Amino acid sequence: MCDHHDRNPNHNNLNRRSLLRGTAAASVAAAAVVAGHGAAQAQTSPLYADPSEPALPASDVVIGQDNTALVVVDPLIDFLSPKGVAWGVVGESVTEHKTVENIGRLFKAAKKAGLVVAVSPHYYYPTDHGWKFSGPLEKLMHAIGMFDRAGPLNLKGFDGSGADFMPEYKDLILDGKTIITSPHKVYGPSTNDLDLQLRKRGVDKVILAGMSANLCVQAHLYDLLERGYEVAVVRDATAAAKVPEGDGYHAALVNFRYVANALWTTDEAVRRIESV
């Protein structure tokens, strides 16, 4: 489905609209199954509450101005805006966690403190649709034109598209100082230049946020850990889909507790950034 699908814009728009209609209903149904109740506040939901008696030893990250970067994964319209193609399944989680607002707070705090700030975006070019095999979510993303761009050197139709940066952050990202890496293509940064950009600036500690929690954020976390970075994940500056297959945010949160060097709220992250 993703390899030779019709690239006609009208067909693609129809697919995007169909997904928004269909997945909105799936999101509501899945939320009821997974969470067991209606619109509970995310961070106070029993589903997301930290264990009262954790078995794993505590760890933390001590950040500094010269060795720490804020890395935001996929702060893009397709993930974070009601206009985006994924809103039908991620919108509830984004709203619960105040993800858009919290990512903005991190951007502003990091800029004010003089930290390195990097964005790792997800883009697909026409040549990427020639892949011969893909996983389930890759197939879906290709079929509905998620993160599609006209080409690596072609910005036609980019402004305001699903692949564009959220308008709330666009001025901060395009300030001439933010690192905008080459795009990652599946989930993690092994296919882009994030590691190079951070190492060249002496960064060995990362504050990680963005979308989607159980996909690209989690993949970035694992890759950065394997490369020797200390990583603090900001738990309410991310979100994930709720579908019949499961609650992506809950799945990610469990793994964040297992492997991240630290797991902070936005309030805590901002406080620490302001103190460097």
For every predicted segment, state its role:
Residues 2-32, 42-69, 78, 105-113, ...:
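Active-site-adjacent betaalpha module
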Residues 71-73:
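Short hydrophobic beta-strand that contains or immediately precedes a catalytic carboxylate
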Residues 76-82:
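Short acidic, Gly/Ser-rich segments with clustered Asp/Glu that frequently serve as metal-coordination loops
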Residues 125-129:
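Short catalytic/ligand-binding loop motif for oxyanion handling, primarily in non-cytosolic enzymes
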Residues 115-122, 234:
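Short beta-strand segments at enzyme active-site cores
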